[in-house]
Curated annotation (Swiss-Prot):
Quaternary structure, from the entry: Component of a multi-subunit COQ enzyme complex, composed of at least COQ3, COQ4, COQ5, COQ6, COQ7 and COQ9. Interacts directly with COQ4.
Protein name: Ubiquinone biosynthesis O-methyltransferase, mitochondrial
Classification via Gene3D superfamilies: Vaccinia Virus protein VP39 (3.40.50.150)
GO cellular component: extrinsic component of mitochondrial inner membrane; mitochondrial inner membrane; mitochondrion
Recorded catalytic activity of this chain's protein: 3,4-dihydroxy-5-(all-trans-hexaprenyl)benzoate + S-adenosyl-L-methionine = 4-hydroxy-3-methoxy-5-(all-trans-hexaprenyl)benzoate + S-adenosyl-L-homocysteine + H(+); a 3-demethylubiquinone + S-adenosyl-L-methionine = a ubiquinone + S-adenosyl-L-homocysteine; 3-demethylubiquinol-6 + S-adenosyl-L-methionine = ubiquinol-6 + S-adenosyl-L-homocysteine + H(+)
Regulation of catalytic or functional activity: Regulated in response to catabolite repression.
Other noteworthy facts: Present with 259 molecules/cell in log phase SD medium.
Amino acid sequence: MLLRSRFLKVIHVRKQLSACSRFAIQTQTRCKSTDASEDEVKHFQELAPTWWDTDGSQRILHKMNLTRLDFVQRTVRNQVKIQNPEIFVPGFNYKEFLPEYVCDNIQREMQESIETNLDKRPEVSVLDVGCGGGILSESLARLKWVKNVQGIDLTRDCIMVAKEHAKKDPMLEGKINYECKALEDVTGQFDIITCMEMLEHVDMPSEILRHCWSRLNPEKGILFLSTINRDLISWFTTIFMGENVLKIVPKGTHHLSKYINSKEILAWFNDNYSGQFRLLDLKGTMYLPYQGWVEHDCSDVGNYFMAIQRLN
């Protein structure tokens, strides 16, 4: 499989020469194993000025952000246990047997209890890898249960745009920090790490995953991934239609050879961290012109979201 060959290439490179040396052969300016190519950085540098234009180059990303945020919030809420003894949680599919108004009351009380418990929990720290102009970073920083967000990206112009845009919202003061740096230069550990629409733009995705995992809180930290399966449907929707026909995605944004199947990521975790992780959720997602981004259960086709929890 392609992803495994890219992973194995990292191992082979380490045996023959360091990752820095390998990049130094190609260019004298990039020598981090989690770096993107010069072409990738240049491409996103050109997109930086229109990053926050909802009708501009990133309009599809703006629409997708709502679905990404829903996926993150739902996953986190699902980890909150209902501790109020006054709330009865049936041990069966109550929606099939109880009246609708009873089901609605049960659901409402459960949600209220979850929100209350979530607000009482210690606030979480977030690392947004490949934050670009800060679309997801800002949304995460506005959540009440998030203490702070650190956004990193290799494109300096995107970081400048992110910093300037964050100044427009007083709520974000002290809650968000942006830096132009490689992932392996980040210190500390985080409760949540997001790596969304990023893996398909790097040469060594295994290095990104490895460094993300090492910076994830061992006490049940969660890694959120969002990328694209490598298949004909993905090429047709994202490259042929998205970039060339509809032109709703800037041309040159995607490369089929860099797409990663969801099964390949799970296989990599099983090979490297067997028994040390738990798959919390895996959903496919697709863009419908008159509806926006929606989730579905075919996670091995097109775009997908993945949430992986670290276990002790």
